[in-house]
């Protein structure tokens, strides 16, 4: 099973990022930089789960990946993707290590 973990931190809401509750309500995480290596792992894996974290407020939700839609490129050239998620449900908080883009891909 492959899991995509994305971070929706409360402290980024002031600068225009979508809040954890907005991701939970819409099922869309906006503009996450996913490296080509991470994308290839996700693209070749069936049944990908998604974990949405807010480490600031210690919140966690889990769902199923529906689609990764490329959006604009980041200033560093990294490709940004909107992450579409279905069946999001909240769970007790459990942290995960993230890269500097607020993303990690876990393959079990």
Regions found by a protein language model. Name each.
Residues 56-108:
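Aromatic- and Lys/Arg-enriched surface recognition patch
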Residues 48-58:
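Short aromatic-glycine motifs in intrinsically disordered, low-complexity regions
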């Amino acid at each position: 099973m492959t899991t995509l973990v994305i971070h929706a931190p409360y402290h980024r809401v002031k600068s225009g990022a979508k809040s954890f509750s907005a991701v939970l309500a819409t099922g869309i995480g906006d503009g996450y930089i996913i490296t080509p290596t991470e994308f290839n792992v996700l693209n070749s894996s069936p049944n990908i789960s998604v974990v949405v974290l807010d480490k600031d407020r210690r919140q966690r939700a889990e769902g199923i990946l529906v689609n990764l839609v490329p959006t604009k490129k980041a200033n560093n050239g990294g490709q940004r993707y909107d992450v579409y998620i279905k069946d999001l449900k909240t769970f007790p908080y459990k942290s995960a290590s993230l890269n500097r883009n607020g993303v990690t891909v876990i393959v079990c």
